[in-house]
Swiss-Prot record:
It is a single-pass type II membrane protein. Keywords: Endoplasmic reticulum, Membrane, Phosphoprotein, Protein transport, Signal-anchor, Transmembrane, Transmembrane helix, Transport. This is Translocation protein sec66. It comes from Schizosaccharomyces pombe (strain 972 / ATCC 24843). The keyword Transmembrane helix applies. The gene is sec66.
């Protein structure tokens, strides 16, 4: 004899599993709607700053908008350079069968997002000052190269300390080996 609790338990389990599946599907759809660039690179603060300046009331000065746009374009170029390097590694992994279709699809979406971002930057630059879209990326590339040079220069004092310490230890080892060879040569000559 089947009690009244069996169908109730069955319905409860069925409803709970349906709720779990629907929640999982909604969660995965929400993740896909989020920009892929935020997953890979994190939040784009320079873009957020530019749009907040653009929507300010009263409007921000042109020079401030241009500076924010240069920062946004610089960040876009940095991301593009990272993508180019990552594309080579991804192709290598793809040839070996080390990555799945999901990653390839996300990477393709990321490249499209970055291209659209750079095209939007070029259009915005042209709207701020006609013809500026031709020069903004050259300026941003120079900024990136300048930052690389500054990071190398900033690391020189750290490198000097490590090189100096290494040289001191090598100098002591060299002097000890030289002293040992000198003593051995004197023994062979009969001086000692």
């Amino acid at each position: 004899m089947v009690s009244i609790y069996v169908p109730l338990i069955y319905i409860t389990i069925l409803m709970g599993s349906m709720y779990g599946v629907s929640r999982f599907v909604r969660k995965s759809k929400n993740q896909e709607s989020k920009p892929v660039s935020e997953e890979w690179f994190g939040e784009n603060y320079s873009r957020n700053i530019f749009f907040s300046l653009l929507q300010q009331n009263p409007p921000a000065e042109d020079t401030l908008l241009k500076a924010a746009l240069v920062l946004r374009a610089t960040e876009g170029l940095r991301r593009l350079m990272k993508l180019k390097v990552s594309r080579m590694a991804l192709n290598n992994l793809l040839n070996r069968g080390g990555v799945g279709d999901e990653l390839i699809r996300k990477f393709g979406r990321l490249e499209k997002e970055t291209e659209l971002e750079l095209m939007d930057i070029a259009k915005t630059a042209n709207s701020l000052q006609p013809g500026w879209n031709q020069f903004i990326f050259q300026t941003c590339n120079e900024i990136i190269e300048n930052e690389k040079i500054h990071s190398i220069i900033d690391n020189i004092p750290k490198d000097i300390d490590s090189i100096s310490q290494r040289w001191q230890t090598e100098k002591i080892l060299y002097e000890a080996a030289d002293e040992e060879l000198r003593i051995q040569a004197q023994k062979e000559l009969g001086v000692l």
